[in-house]
């Protein structure tokens, strides 16, 4: 079967991508690790001894980076609807975060109000239609935010992928009502044509 022009272009861009090459050279599972690293370098989000949850973790770039920063201490739980190869000192849940039984499995692992940091790089399968994709993406952000409000300890932090579009301003407003500091970041590793950004919320207020 012949590849479409768009898929050929994507593959060419992918293999020419400086972050893809860097990830391969440095032993990381995905280029996405550099999005988290850039933000963490500025904000010092991840430290040894923390309790951290990583949503939308597969193939494991963010989890891999967090595990390295935590140096085998604390607790790191990763969750994804797709399988992920094991990583040192990481507990992995295979399941759909939108399903109640999967959410409960995660809650059972993390005592309430002990979570230091919630990471979420979750995104829906993209259809190419903003009218479909943005609401799906915002729903995942809302679920992550609800989980954070239930589980974060006072002063805890959250970093979630969020797409510009309908509902964006309302979610930012909601975050500002619950956290001391809220900023929007677009790391240099994010593709320029992508609508993705990252909402960083620090200092959770009960």
From Swiss-Prot:
Active site per database record: 161
Protein family: Belongs to the class I-like SAM-binding methyltransferase superfamily. RNA methyltransferase RlmE family.
Annotated positions binding S-adenosyl-L-methionine: 60, 62, 80, 96, 121
Entry GO terms, CC: cytoplasm
Protein name, as recorded: Ribosomal RNA large subunit methyltransferase E
Subcellular location: Cytoplasm
GO molecular function terms attached to this record: rRNA (uridine-2'-O-)-methyltransferase activity
Domain of life of the organism encoding this protein: Bacteria
SUPFAM superfamilies to which the protein is assigned, alphabetical: S-adenosyl-L-methionine-dependent methyltransferases
Function per UniProt: Specifically methylates the uridine in position 2552 of 23S rRNA at the 2'-O position of the ribose in the fully assembled 50S ribosomal subunit.
Main location: cytoplasm
Reactions listed under catalytic activity: uridine(2552) in 23S rRNA + S-adenosyl-L-methionine = 2'-O-methyluridine(2552) in 23S rRNA + S-adenosyl-L-homocysteine + H(+)
Alphabetical list of InterPro entries matching this protein: RNA_methyltr_RlmE (IPR050082), RNA_MeTrfase_FtsJ_dom (IPR002877), rRNA-MeTfrase_E (IPR015507), SAM-dependent_MTases_sf (IPR029063)
Top-level taxonomy: Bacteria, Pseudomonadati, Pseudomonadota, Gammaproteobacteria, Legionellales
Keywords: Cytoplasm, Methyltransferase, rRNA processing, S-adenosyl-L-methionine, Transferase
EC numbers: 2.1.1.166
Keyword S-adenosyl-L-methionine attributed: yes
């Amino acid at each position: 079967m012949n590849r479409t022009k768009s898929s050929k272009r994507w593959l060419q861009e992918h293999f020419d991508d400086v972050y893809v090459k860097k990830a391969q050279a440095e032993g990381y599972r995905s280029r996405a690790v550099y999005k988290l690293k850039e933000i963490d370098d500025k904000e010092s989000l991840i430290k040894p001894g923390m309790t951290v949850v990583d949503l939308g973790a597969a193939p494991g770039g963010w989890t891999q980076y967090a595990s390295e920063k935590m140096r085998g201490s604390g607790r790191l739980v990763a969750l994804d609807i797709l399988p992920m190869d094991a990583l040192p000192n990481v507990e992995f849940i295979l399941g759909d975060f939108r399903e109640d039984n999967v959410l409960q499995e995660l809650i059972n692992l993390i005592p309430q109000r002990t979570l230091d940091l919630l990471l979420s790089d979750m995104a829906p399968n993209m259809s190419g239609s903003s009218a479909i994709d943005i609401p799906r993406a915002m729903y995942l952000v809302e679920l992550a935010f609800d989980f954070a409000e239930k589980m974060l300890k006072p002063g805890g932090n959250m970093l979630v992928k969020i797409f510009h579009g309908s509902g964006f301003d309302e979610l930012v407003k909601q975050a500002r009502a619950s956290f001391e500091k809220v900023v929007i970041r677009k790391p240099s590793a994010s593709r320029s044509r992508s609508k993705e950004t990252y909402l960083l919320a620090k200092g959770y207020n009960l």
